[in-house]
Design a protein with these regions (language model features):
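Conformational coupling and interaction surfaces
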Residues: 64-84, 99-105, 109, 260-267, ...
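Active-site histidine-anchored catalytic micro-motif
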Residues: 76-131, 139, 171-290
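Phospho-regulated, proline-rich, acidic Ser/Thr-rich intrinsically disordered regions
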Residues: 7-10, 14
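Surface-exposed loop and adjacent secondary-structure segments within mature catalytic domains
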Residues: 144-176
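Cysteine-centered motifs
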Residues: 34-37
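Low-complexity, intrinsically disordered or signal/transmembrane-proximal segments
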Residues: 8, 41-42, 50, 57
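A glycine-rich helix N-cap at a beta->alpha junction
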Residues: 136-144
Length: 398
């Protein structure tokens, strides 16, 4: 399959077989020659331990960006919350559900939700997103099904944390927004009577409104990597990308040195960080905090308590009585910049594609002589204002 045919496939339905062909082509060839790629990029030789260098362009910004054209929310402090046109790409487990609820509570414009396999199967992800939207009274938001597997390795589900359904085993207590059985659905969303793949929709939305869409990648980065392969200009058409994944200190949660989202699809993380020509902010695993949400008797609070019960059982030994915020921190960083307490600016980073204990690790150039081929940079959030995050989360369930 040549690049011309790959681009043409954007106009046609991405069947599972086509998707797999593109994936195989993606990981065995050099990227197209274009200004989004690092000059030092080399084709991936599958099976050979190696590190691909990350080369990302971003504009210079302050640690806490100024609020331009802000929209005021009704949070208690009266602090400003930015309005953004958001697309959330999720592998909807418990933390993704919280992030989606938070985004909908902060008066942002959620244009669409795209689904990728990760915490649970992509079939479950579509259903879980619909459940969250129904609980929030926002079932009109379109949902698109995407990749059901990583680019080059088997999918490793997170059942032990998120439950077999991705929502702590309570999904049957909350109806989906659509009537009927979803088990046999191929995709969600349609154009001219045919299903639309999430990667196609991401490309179309960014192309229609260049510079307007903020993309939140809250699961494995497979859909975004596929979109960048189909359309090398996809990243340039986005306003910015925020990623939940990677690490700073080399601490992992699925491998000694790797975080789940990057470890699930390291090649996809590498593609996004090398080819997306737009500002990128990474919220790594170490930045996660715990926060208590007020006990309120609302539909959203009951939903949150139900889906987090399973996850909290996983953390009983820690003695924590709060919810692990996870993906919701990315939403806070996007819409409430004052929630960010500290960040590393202009970081040069690389994704480790080999390694028995470190595959998927986000490696940093801590001194100027390290990673000399990496010139472009990303912003990495390292800590949050816990009081501000707690305030946002408490308002989330009202």
């Amino acid at each position: 399959m040549d690049l011309r045919r790959m681009r043409q496939s954007v106009k046609d339905r991405l069947s599972l077989m086509e998707e797999r062909e593109i994936i195989r082509e993606l990981i065995t060839r050099a990227p197209p020659r274009c200004f989004t790629c690092s000059p030092s990029y080399q084709p991936l030789r599958t099976g050979a331990p190696q590190m691909e260098m990350v080369n990302v362009q971003r504009r210079r910004t302050s640690s806490l960006p100024r609020l331009l054209g802000v929209a005021m929310s009704d949070v208690d402090s009266g602090q400003a919350v930015r309005d953004r046109r958001l697309v959330l790409d999720v592998d909807c487990g418990v933390d993704d559900a919280l992030a989606l609820i938070l985004a909908l509570s902060l008066h942002s414009t959620v244009e669409a939700v795209t689904c990728v396999a990760g915490n649970t199967t992509v079939q479950n992800v579509v259903k879980n997103v619909r459940r969250v939207l129904a609980v929030c009274g926002r079932s009109e938001i379109p949902v698109y099904r995407g990749c059901e597997q990583p680019l080059s390795q088997p999918l490793d589900l997170a059942d032990e944390y998120h439950g077999c359904d991705g929502l702590g085993g309570v999904s049957d207590q909350f109806a989906c927004s659509d009537d009927g059985d979803l088990e046999d659905e191929e995709d969600d969303g349609s154009v001219a009577g045919r299903p639309v793949h999430a990667a196609e929709k991401l490309i179309a939305m960014a192309r229609t409104d260049p510079g307007q869409i903020t993309l939140l990648l809250l699961g494995p980065l497979t859909n975004a990597a596929l979109a960048l392969t189909l359309d090398p200009r996809f990243g340039a058409n986005l306003k910015e990308i925020f990623i939940l994944g990677g690490n700073v200190e080399g601490r992992g949660n699925v491998l000694p040195g790797a975080e789940y989202n990057f470890k699930t699809d390291p090649e996809a993380a590498n593609v996004v960080l090398t080819r997306a020509q737009c500002p990128i902010t990474i919220v790594p695993w170490e930045a996660e905090v715990y926060s208590m949400m007020t006990r309120q008797d609302t539909a959203k609070s009951r939903f949150v308590r139900a889906i987090t019960r399973f996850s909290l059982g996983y953390y009983d030994k820690s003695g924590s009585s709060g919810y692990e915020v996870g993906d919701a921190l990315v939403v806070a960083a996007v819409l409430a910049p004052d929630s960010v307490a500290s960040a590393l600016e202009e970081r040069r980073v690389a994704v480790e594609l080999g390694g028995t204990h470190t595959r998927g690790q986000l490696v940093h150039a801590w001194t100027t002589d390290l990673l000399p081929d990496v010139k472009r940079t990303v912003r990495v959030v390292t800590s949050f204002n816990k009081e501000r995050v707690s305030e946002l989360l408490m308002r989330m369930v009202v």
